């Protein structure tokens, strides 16, 4: 009978650690890397590069989009930091959990139970906080997507050859070209006529087509950004669903852990399974924290 109790306890405890580890591993390998933030950083810089290529109305929308993308990134990394903090707690507690197997007794078993419940409880709390941050991040992406639709409409109007913005750009080009022609004349009035004729040919044959191409490049950039933002929002929504499933699983195993008797006679295989699960989660935490800048890894107890 004692052996059956021990096996049941091992199964519950091992499941508790593995469930928490699974949630962290999911965050580490999927949720935390779902958005290509390096690409987004470059994109945000690109927003400023085109600031001379759209109207004031479009400029306001671009400013709003930039703020929303930066807000989304802030909230996403806020979620990352929350999980980082959980890792810091987990490595310390699981190390203590492993060491408590030495000269095992009922008091140490009770301490182990408290440790696992603390890890699971803190996990639910921290992952829920991360979930809220991801929700806000997703909302900012969604709002940015709406602004990008409005921007596309604005740019379509601006870049129409009949628009006041397009005509103002053409007028600027003409003014600069004719000013250059006048400054370069050396052959009197007839030279001026010839220079203006050349300037007119350059304007209509080269400069205006170049303007059209340049403005098309700007619109294509924002069309591409719109698709990227929509995909990012979709990916975060999928990430939130996965995380919600993991949080629910931790909550369920926490309830089972709370009602499990911990003080049983473990054989060597059982001890190996439990220590192995704990060490694996410590390594997962180390991997996560290292990827987020921690230089010194937590040393896994060699027992």
From Swiss-Prot:
The keyword Transmembrane applies. Monomer and oligomer. In periplasm, it is present as a monomer, while in outer membrane vesicles, it oligomerizes to form a pore structure that is active. The pore is formed by a dodecamer. Toxin, which has some hemolytic activity towards mammalian cells. Acts by forming a pore-like structure upon contact with mammalian cells. It is a single-pass membrane protein. In periplasm, it forms a disulfide bond, which prevents the oligomerization. In outer membrane vesicles, the redox status prevents formation of the disulfide bond, leading to oligomerization and pore formation. It is found in: Secreted; Periplasm; Host cell membrane. This is Hemolysin E. SUPFAM superfamilies: Bacterial hemolysins (SSF58100). NCBIfam families: PRK11376.1. Belongs to the hemolysin E family. One of its GO terms (cellular component) is extracellular region. Keywords: Cytolysis, Disulfide bond, Hemolysis, Host cell membrane, Host membrane, Membrane, Periplasm, Secreted, Toxin, Transmembrane, Transmembrane helix, Virulence. GO terms for molecular function: pore-forming activity; toxin activity. The chain crosses the membrane at residues 179-199. Disulfide bonds join 87-285. The keyword Chaperone does not apply. It comes from Salmonella typhi. GO terms for biological process: hemolysis in another organism; symbiont-mediated hemolysis of host erythrocyte.
